[in-house]
């Protein structure tokens, strides 16, 4: 039963690019993307605040679902659509403050135990990864593969889910076929020879998400 402690999100979030700059946020919104995440790593709040403010403003202008990775205090301060947290960030974050501010919450998971932890927090959506090997970040866990992803999606049947990790344009149809509601991509767009074409093709496969 999908009864999150945070505001709900659509069951299908569709194509969900994760990018590290306001420039990419603006490009992708202009290309028709409506779910996306600003993920800037390892900088102090004051160093990223201007980018967070600009990204949130763009998200509002395009009526998009913009999640801020990790910088939950800034997300609350500037009223982002939502926050995305890794497992390691859950303990150090004031979830009550995020809830009280009316922000949506997404949580990363890598196995059944982490799914249990995520479910206990009753977030707005649960991310499942990493599906395939990925060069974007060092991962302590092994890739899950499509079979494991499908099992997790079935377990979380009522929950909005996001698949992430090594999802290329070629692999995207098989990932969507598991029933997952969204695919998060990074290098499939940012390292594509033609990012506009890649984005259009991925939108064709994953959609823009439900309203």
From Swiss-Prot:
Keywords on record: Magnesium, Metal-binding, Thiamine biosynthesis, Transferase
Note accompanying the cofactor annotation: Binds 1 Mg(2+) ion per subunit.
Leader peptide range in chain numbering: none
Annotated 4-amino-2-methyl-5-(diphosphooxymethyl)pyrimidine binding sites: 37-41, 69, 108, 137
Enzyme category, top tier: transferase
GO molecular function: magnesium ion binding; thiamine-phosphate diphosphorylase activity
Sequence positions that bind Mg(2+): 70, 89
GO cellular component, one term: cytoplasm
EC number: 2.5.1.3
Family matches, as InterPro entries: Aldolase_TIM, ThiamineP_synth_sf, ThiamineP_synth_TenI, TMP_synthase
Family named by the database record: Belongs to the thiamine-phosphate synthase family.
Family matches, as HAMAP family: TMP_synthase
Function noted in UniProt: Condenses 4-methyl-5-(beta-hydroxyethyl)thiazole monophosphate (THZ-P) and 2-methyl-4-amino-5-hydroxymethyl pyrimidine pyrophosphate (HMP-PP) to form thiamine monophosphate (TMP).
Name assigned to this protein: Thiamine-phosphate synthase
Gene: thiE
